[in-house]
UniProtKB/Swiss-Prot annotation:
GO CC annotation terms, alphabetical: pilus
Assembly and interaction partners: Homomer.
Subcellular location: Fimbrium
Function field: Fimbriae (also called pili) are polar filaments radiating from the surface of the bacterium to a length of 0.5-1.5 micrometers and numbering 100-300 per cell. They enable bacteria to colonize the epithelium of specific host organs. Flexible pili possess hemagglutinating function.
Keyword terms: Fimbrium, Signal
Organism: Aeromonas hydrophila
Record protein name field: Flexible pilin
Signal peptide: 1-24
Length: 70
């Protein structure tokens, strides 16, 4: 019985959130589009930093390997 109550609460919250998004300005499609745009801008900002860190780690690894062989 507790599972039915939990699942019912989850369904209720999901339906309330969907109704709120549907009645928001522009509807659910525009809200999803804005979320995707926000995620894309985050990726665009962080990708060069991640590549710099990866290149630094690889470079240090190669340097350590060369020092061991010398």
């Amino acid at each position: 019985m507790p599972n039915f109550f939990r699942n019912g609460c989850i369904a209720l919250v999901g339906s309330v959130a969907a109704m709120g998004a549907a009645h928001a300005e522009g509807g659910i499609a525009e809200a999803a589009g804005k979320a995707l745009d926000s995620a894309q801008s985050d990726v665009t900002i962080t990708a060069p930093k991640v590549m710099m860190v990866v290149a630094t780690v690889v470079g240090v690894g190669i340097l350590i390997n060369m020092m061991r062989k010398a």
